[in-house]
């Protein structure tokens, strides 16, 4: 093949230039390179005996002879480099390291000094000679970031210093590496930008973060991070460092340490877009550890820091932080439900106030959410249970009438009436009168809005009675008519009450014709076994007919008057 032919040609050429040291040295180097390439090609072809071939021995021998015979050859740095490679290929790593050491000592300015130092660093690191490895990696970094070994050397420099227990000194190269790889990340790009790195770059970044977690765990945990960042500044990825350390503690079931680490970042940079999500991690760590009181405190801290009226939302638009808003809702609901249940169990007034406060915050922050109506109902319930009937009335009515129809709408409207009645018992005089009128208005609104509610007829009937008692006869009649006109019909006892209101109101308004007809209807709903009531109705009918006769006589219509008086004896013979 062409490689074999080229090697044969160089061997012949060596014989021809035996008297010319320059050409002979160049030919020896080139032949050595070809022999080494042939060895590598055989290895790639999975020839396990490749190192036992003449090519390998020839390459090593040529490089050694060249270095010995021509110590001043201008490319001896390359020869040493190739000889070190040959030793490494042959598994003679001690010889390879010795050769690289010689190269560094003799040719410190060789163009590939960065690669040489990196390879030395790798060999020294494997031999646990961390001091020497550290110096080798520093040399690569001093070469400059144009070296393709620069980033890997930053990584291994950090590890070398860590192995030497130089924990704080080990951090700088790791942070320098992260600054290069993700220091310009826009948080909005987040994971998508990280996913855009090559597989090798992703692994390098992930390994670096893992190391930092281990290193900071040796440096006092979150306090160590705080101290370091106080001198270096706060990189865009700092939240990942706190989060990863917290995750490390969590994996070891060090729940309090995990929570305190997450919270350290929140305290360090509370307005950072990721801070609320780490506050969530605080809560979850305490939950996993079984610390209910600390869970409660964590939820309160979340709401206090990230309520919708806080500075966080000035800097971080809601539409870009929907997850934070969702956690805020969940924590508000959890706090309200916790204190509501606690109040119902223990009856402590402070727990009632606490529950109401969290419900009110939820409604203030999320007034138009689908579950806001139900939350408003729960607020009204806690107020009623705590006997704050005045406030309960307002919240029940808001629940019933201020939202689109929902499953608690009608129940809230009816509950408002109960709250009205309870609060009225605490009032007197004009204040009580005004409140009672509001109660009647609310009753009418309830019956009109929720005619299908099982209590709608009873509410209307009660309102009709109350209006009659207040001498509001026209309105009492209208409400009574609404009761008797309901479909399906209300129960007979309510019909009886409604017709009583209608008939008496018409009579008191001197509408005796209408009163008479209403009393006939009332008679239909008065049971036969209530003779006293039936007697009263007959007397009312008689009075209505008599009053019609009197009215006709006063108007000069004697014929009509006589008809009424005559009819009186027929309709009410006794």
Q: Which residues are covered by each model-predicted region?
A:
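Acidic, polar-rich low-complexity tracts and alpha-helical solenoid repeat scaffolds
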Residues: 1-574
